[in-house]
Amino acid sequence: LHSFPTRRSSDLAHPHDGAGQGLIKKIVEISRRPEFLGKIIFLENYDMQLARRLVSGVDIWMNTPTRPLEASGTSGEKALMNGVVNFSVLDGWWLEGYREGAGWALTEKRTYQNQDHQDQLDAATIYSILENEILPLYYARNRKGYSEGWVKTIKNSIAQVAPHYTMKRQLDDYYAKFYTKEAKRFKELVANNYAKA
């Protein structure tokens, strides 16, 4: 790890989101200032190919949006499907997806209304979790050169979280919650030559 925090951003703003585009422009401008060179890296032209490279090149996917402003967090879902462990605020998809032992999370609830105070607390919490939980687990190598605990966390993530974000789960939910109920209702309506219609 670097001796200073490095932020990577590859966000896209909706074409009609002028405020979002302005924010991204401001981040890029700040990242070019001498005091931030090497500390903020903005990856331009984010697309599926770049996402694939990012996902295949990391061991942990850290996403720390301001609560409750995470739109969804699909990049974390992509990472999950590729065996990457997540560390995020309990917001967006991670609010539903998080399972203890299958990744790490910052609390869902804010402690402070003042955003600066909340950011300071979140930063301290992030570093504490990184230094006291994540890094020791990651670097606890056995004689074969890998961390059994880290591999267990990856397996837990794939087994306990990933199945909830598949097309099969989505189709099963659709079938159980909508299709079967509507099919039953249809049969009732057409029975006895549409007597109940």
Located regions from the model:
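Short, structured helix-loop element that forms part of the nucleotide-activated donor/catalytic region
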Residues: 13-36
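Catalytic binding pocket for nucleotide-activated donors in carbohydrate/polymer assembly enzymes
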Residues: 55-164, 168-182, 186-189
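Active-site donor-binding acidic/aromatic loop of nucleotide-activated sugar
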Residues: 38-47
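Surface beta-strand/loop "capping" patches
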Residues: 190-197
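Structural alpha-helical scaffold elements that stabilize or flank donor/cofactor-binding regions
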Residues: 1, 53-54
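Short, small-residue-biased leader/transition segments that mark boundaries at the very start
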Residues: 2-9
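Short, conserved secondary-structure transition motifs
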Residues: 13-17, 46-53, 162
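Short hydrophobic "strand-cap" motifs at the C-terminus of beta-strands
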Residues: 10-11, 43
